[in-house]
């Protein structure tokens, strides 16, 4: 699921030639996808919390297949392009990508091991990040965009079968269980939105969404703008996927040793450095490789500590739902990153302004994570 989502930026030239869409229209479709992904993450999270993650994820894959089918078979221009690539695939990702799978797996582990567990799930997504861009670039050249999208349906079929085996633990492994066992979802929601740390976490994850979607969507166009070949962007995306495996696993381990908010501060600061070096250096294959590796290590490394902080504060009973809301904030940032990248290019002929924003937002995220208090509600109520 995450691997396929990573490839859509590689389709832009084909969509431009075959469907006549502009960069702004393409960016808008990806932005809509991000918003619907975000809106449906807490909804599918609630389905997972109440009825099981397998049901939520399976439904998501069915919708994913419908979106891909409509995208290659038609109608797929104008508003229908926005519906297929934007709305349907966005809804599907709300169930199949990151928030629900990570949270469902996290429920099986105690707090001290939870970041490792979520890191493993995120690393699995990174395998898709590595393989999917390479496969897509090859398939687009050999078979064309319609056939490539048809091949995507086989991956979706595999994912839907695997999703049937996602089961919740028979008993929650949660120190907050005595407090949350009779708590309703709306009570948990009220607690979350009155917790300063939860609100700051939402603000920080907004930045993550802006950055990774800007890069995933517009790095092919950005590399073309800088006079680099199409394979440069593919290599960047593939390296991001490969080194994200190392980054998420490493962050999962570090989350058991150090304060999660401190790790997030460091991550966002390093993102600012990585982006700045990349855009202010002369374009070259070496810099493409350096950026792919460096940003890959930081790509989804934010997920284990972010998910871990939510679970640490509020417990795991409504983890899929509460983390889904944090992920909605992520997707609002993703919408803005996807849309502004295309908008700035069409208006000013350059992606530079969008990347300047990405650097500034990294500094903002570094600052807002520092005051987060990750003390659980068990402790707060006891005092």
Regions found by a protein language model. Give the residues of each.
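Helix-to-loop junctions at the C-terminal end of transmembrane segments
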Residues: 41-52, 249-259
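Intracellular juxtamembrane helix-capping segments at the cytosolic ends
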Residues: 95-109, 301-314
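Conserved small/polar residues in nucleotide/adenosyl-binding loops
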Residues: 378-383
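Helix-loop-helix hairpin linking two adjacent transmembrane segments in secondary transporters
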Residues: 124-168
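C-terminal transmembrane helical hairpin of 12-TM major facilitator-type secondary transporters
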Residues: 261-309
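Extracytoplasmic gate region of multi-pass secondary transporters
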Residues: 8-9, 197-238
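Hydrophobic core of transmembrane alpha-helices in multi-pass small-molecule transporters
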Residues: 80-95, 287-301
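C-terminal ends and interior cores of transmembrane alpha-helices
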Residues: 63-76, 271-282
């Amino acid at each position: 699921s995450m691997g396929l989502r990573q490839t859509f930026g590689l389709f832009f030239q084909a969509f431009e030639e075959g469907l006549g869409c502009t960069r702004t229209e393409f960016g808008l479709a990806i932005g809509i996808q991000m918003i619907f992904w975000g809106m449906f993450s807490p909804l599918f999270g609630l389905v997972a919390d109440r009825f099981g993650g397998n049901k939520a994820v399976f439904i998501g894959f069915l919708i994913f297949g419908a979106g891909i089918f409509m995208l290659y078979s038609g109608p797929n221009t104008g508003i229908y392009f926005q519906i297929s690539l934007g709305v349907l695939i966005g809804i599907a990702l709300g169930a199949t990508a990151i928030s629900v799978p990570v949270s469902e797996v996290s429920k099986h582990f105690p707090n001290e091991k939870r970041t490792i567990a979520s890191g493993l799930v995120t690393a699995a997504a990174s395998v898709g990040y590595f393989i999917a861009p390479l496969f897509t670039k090859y398939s687009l050249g050999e078979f064309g965009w319609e056939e490539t999208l048809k091949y995507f349906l086989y991956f979706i079929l595999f994912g839907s079968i695997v999703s049937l085996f996602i089961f919740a633990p028979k008993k929650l492994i949660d120190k907050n269980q005595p407090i949350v066992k009779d708590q309703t979802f709306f009570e948990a929601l009220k607690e979350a939105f009155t917790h300063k740390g939860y609100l700051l976490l939402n603000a920080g994850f907004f930045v993550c969404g802006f950055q990774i979607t800007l890069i995933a969507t517009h790095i092919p166009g950005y590399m073309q703008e800088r006079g680099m070949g199409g394979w440069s962007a593919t290599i960047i995306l593939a390296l991001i996927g490969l080194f994200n495996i190392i980054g998420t696993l490493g962050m999962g381990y570090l989350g058991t040793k150090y304060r999660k908010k401190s790790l997030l501060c460091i991550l966002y600061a390093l993102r600012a450095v990585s982006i700045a070096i990349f855009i202010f250096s002369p374009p070259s294959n070496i810099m493409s490789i350096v950026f792919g590796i460096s940003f890959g290590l930081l790509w989804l490394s934010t997920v284990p500590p972010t998910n871990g902080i939510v679970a640490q504060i509020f417990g795991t009973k409504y983890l899929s739902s509460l983390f889904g809301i944090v992920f909605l904030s992520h997707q609002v940032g993703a919408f803005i990153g996807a849309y502004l990248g295309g908008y700035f290019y069409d208006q000013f002929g350059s992606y530079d302004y969008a990347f300047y924003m990405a650097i500034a937002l990294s500094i903002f995220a570094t600052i807002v994570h520092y005051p987060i208090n990750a003390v659980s509600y068990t402790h707060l109520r006891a005092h």
